[in-house]
Design a protein with these regions (language model features):
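Active-site metal-coordination segments of metallo-dependent hydrolases
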Residues: 73, 130-139, 181, 293-298, ...
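Short acidic/histidine-rich active-site segments
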Residues: 197-207, 211-213
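Cysteine-centered catalytic environments shared across enzyme families
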Residues: 1-167, 171-173, 185, 329-330, ...
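Adenosyl-5′-phosphate
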Residues: 5-10, 35-42, 52-53, 64-66, ...
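Short low-complexity, flexible loop/linker segments enriched in glycine and/or proline
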Residues: 167-171, 194, 215-218, 351-354
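A mobile, often basic/glycine-rich helix-loop segment
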Residues: 208-234
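Conserved acidic
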Residues: 71-79, 137, 176, 180, ...
């Protein structure tokens, strides 16, 4: 946003990048959605002298080579040491800090580690949804906080919050990510700031490094060579023209050398999904409130250890993050390390379904989507929002983002006014 305000970039969106955003929820590589503006890649350093780039260096995020054998007991002992060291380092601050507690494996592990590292009561925040529902784990998060002697503030995101805050949240994410988790993350950032917190610890990175996603388990299946790679079709399938997957294809080509199939899938996620969706979401939704998000699972020592683990200690037997779960079962039994978790996404599908016709009409005529998708497909996505939320949310977020950053629409009104 600063570059655009200074006149150093064009207030336009590259059509190929819009297609990528709709299909993947994020954009890949160095080129941003704004023509002429590029990202520094993770671990990259540029040396600029007299207005020109004279040197470029990049530190590899992940180690080379395949998994390294290690026994379960030795792995658990090593994991405990590297996690505790990382959390202790991430707690170094001269300002108040806290934790975003979702009730899942990752934030529960951080809760236990923060208590050990600091020896003091942890301040945690969690968020639930109006009406609750099976995807609301905020009460479970509050229970875990009590079990660990932590102070926990529970927020509630209502349907009205969705309609009024979504334009402001889209305006805060200059590098766009159509991940519905931007909504609760923004609310948590606002609550942290209003409560005097300047730093929060967050669980991003654990799934990518310890093998948490179901797509990783598929990479270990005997029939994996017969299946399509992750993100093969995109959110809208063949309705969007070819070319949107070029960035992922390039990452796949670079990720697999000398690695297991599971590691290759992890490496692609660490190269694209993690920095361009999850960490972008975290940075923009927190820093707009002046709050710093810290990610202990992404400590280089933790990342090196986790990525080299044998595949069987990451994914298998119906579960991911097996070693992390085994560690949590011993360190924090109340967390239910092998219980099924429900995720951290608000019921945007049900909320959009309440005004599906209005949203479909407004989105179908929006300049952000013109020529990218047929209008009939846009309307169909909103008509089906309650059953399948992501397509409709991707369309809505993209239109809101385009309005704020390209058209200059003020984000102060509700969704209907912003569109």
């Amino acid at each position: 946003q600063a570059l655009l305000a200074a006149g150093l970039g064009e207030r336009a969106a590259a059509r190929q990048r819009l297609a990528e955003l709709l299909q993947l929820k994020f954009t890949t590589g160095a080129a941003t959605i704004f023509p002429g503006i590029c990202r520094l890649l993770p671990g990259e350093t540029l040396l600029v002298e007299r207005g020109a780039i004279t040197a470029r260096r990049r530190r590899a995020a992940l180690p080379e080579g395949g998994p390294v054998p290690i026994g379960r007991d030795a792995a658990l002992q090593r994991l405990d040491a590297v996690l505790l060291d990382s959390v202790a380092a991430h707690l170094r601050a001269d300002v108040p800090y806290g934790l975003f507690l979702s009730g899942g494996i990752d934030s529960s592990a951080l809760l236990a580690l923060m208590r050990r590292a600091s020896g003091s009561r942890v301040r945690a925040l969690t968020v639930g949804w109006d009406g609750g529902g099976e995807a609301d784990e905020s009460f479970e998060a509050a229970r875990l906080a009590r079990a660990m002697g932590a102070e926990c503030e529970r927020l509630t995101m209502t349907e009205q919050d969705f309609w009024t805050l979504a334009p402001r949240i889209a305006a805060a994410t200059d590098d766009p990510t159509a991940d519905a988790a931007v909504l609760p993350s923004w609310m948590l950032g606002r609550a942290a700031a209003s409560g005097g917190l300047k730093v929060t610890l967050c669980g991003e990175g654990a799934d990518e490094l310890f093998g948490g996603y179901s797509r990783y388990r598929k990479r270990r299946a005997p029939w994996r060579w017969l299946t399509r790679p992750p993100r093969a079709r995109g959110i809208f399938g063949g309705a969007i023209a070819d070319g949107w997957r070029d960035g992922i294809t390039a990452a796949e080509a670079a990720a697999g050398q000398g690695r297991s199939a599971l590691q290759a899938a992890q490496a692609v996620d660490c190269a694209e999904w993690l920095p361009n969706d999850l960490l972008t979401k975290l940075d923009r939704t927190l820093m707009v409130h002046g709050v710093e998000g810290r990610t202990p699972f992404l400590d280089p020592v933790v990342a090196d250890f986790a990525f080299r683990l044998p595949d069987a200690r990451k994914a298998g037997a119906g579960f991911g993050k097996r070693l992390l779960r085994d560690w949590l079962a011993g360190a924090f039994p109340e967390a239910g390390a092998y219980a099924r978790k429900k995720g951290f996404k608000p019921p945007v599908g049900a909320w959009m379904a309440q005004r599906a016709d209005m949203l479909g009409d407004l989105a179908a005529g929006h300049p952000a989507l013109a020529g990218v998708l047929p209008t009939a497909r846009i309307r169909a996505a909103f008509a089906d929002a309650e059953r399948s939320a992501q397509p409709a949310w991707s369309l809505l977020f993209t239109a809101l983002w385009y309005g704020a950053h390209v058209l200059g629409v003020p984000p102060d009104g509700d969704i209907g006014e912003a569109l």
